[in-house]
Amino acid sequence: MPADTGMEKPTASPIAGAPASASHTPDKPRSASEHRKSSKPIMEKRRRARINESLGQLKMLILDALKKDSSRHSKLEKADILEMTVKHLRNLQRAQMAAALSADPSVLGKYRAGFNECMNEVTRFLSTCEGVNADVRARLLGHLSACLGQIVAMNYLPPPPAGQPAHLAQPLHVQLPPTTTGAVPVPCKLEPTEALSPKVYGGFQLVPATDGQFAFLIPNPAFPPGSGPVIPLYANANVPVSTAWRSSERVHPPAGIPGAGLDIIWARVVPASQAGSPIAERREAVWRPW
């Protein structure tokens, strides 16, 4: 028989068999950018959940306000819900304006005067602020002029009684600030009691000048005979201007300006002793959107 060698199988060392993770160092704290990247999917999921929840509530509110059966409109798209909400809010705004006019007939004039004041402030800022793109400035002022045309084209109030003060008529003033120190803006007045054609009056044309000022070109049929103009005028700072009048002379604009068929608007400069007091009309409180 072979001799017993007495050899034993080698056993694994407890140190060698220890897992490698036992010697792993703890994680370092993540930076803010890494934390944002890791939490971005969670934040996006929460944001979408908030949007969907708000749209669901808005859908129930708008269907209830429009008195529509929610079971027949159970699968409205998000765009449909938003469009229905916008239309409903516009109708509410018109209804509130009509109710305010029935309670106080001077509200519309105050609204126009307030919008005009805001437009003058925006125009003054754009004229004095440096670094504003000329195209952006022209588009913004063109949009404001279009909005002003829509406001002026709204239903006018009946003429005030003979004994009513003149300041209740709420004339509309439109003025652009000058870019030089030697000129002051002279507002031309359009009484809100005068009837204008809304289809024609809304079509203002904005023509920028080389010196940074802007001019509004108004079509010929926009003003019936005897009506006052709505256009910015400037006069010398030492001579006050009282009223403006409309001439039937036709204007031939320079080349490149689409202004054919327009009427020229003149201003009559009178001494201060003969001038009236139209400034008192603007002391009436105006409506402001803030």
UniProtKB/Swiss-Prot annotation:
InterPro entries assigned to the protein according to its UniProt record, in alphabetical order: bHLH_dom (IPR011598), HES_HEY (IPR050370), HLH_DNA-bd_sf (IPR036638), Orange_dom (IPR003650)
Region (Disordered): 1-47
CDD domains xref list: bHLH-O_HES1_4 (cd11459)
GO molecular function, one term: protein heterodimerization activity
Keyword Acyltransferase attributed: no
Gene3D superfamilies: 6.10.250.980, Helix-loop-helix DNA-binding domain (4.10.280.10)
Boundaries of every Orange domain copy: 111-144
GO cellular component, one term: nucleus
Keyword Repressor: yes
Record's subcellular location: Nucleus
Composition bias, Low complexity: 10-23
Amino acid composition bias (Basic and acidic residues), ranges on this chain: 25-36
Keywords: DNA-binding, Nucleus, Repressor, Transcription, Transcription regulation
A GO biological-process term: regulation of DNA-templated transcription
bHLH domain segment(s): 35-92
Motif WRPW motif in this chain: 287-290
Assembly description: Transcription repression requires formation of a complex with a corepressor protein of the Groucho/TLE family.
Domain statement: Has a particular type of basic domain (presence of a helix-interrupting proline) that binds to the N-box (CACNAG), rather than the canonical E-box (CANNTG). The C-terminal WRPW motif is a transcriptional repression domain necessary for the interaction with Groucho/TLE family members, transcriptional corepressors recruited to specific target DNA by Hairy-related proteins.
Protein purpose: Transcriptional repressor of genes that require a bHLH protein for their transcription. May act as a negative regulator of myogenesis by inhibiting the functions of MYOD1 and ASH1.
Name this polypeptide is given: Transcription factor HES-1
UniProt organism field: Gallus gallus
Lineage, broadest ranks: Eukaryota, Metazoa, Chordata, Craniata, Vertebrata
Chain's gene name: HES1
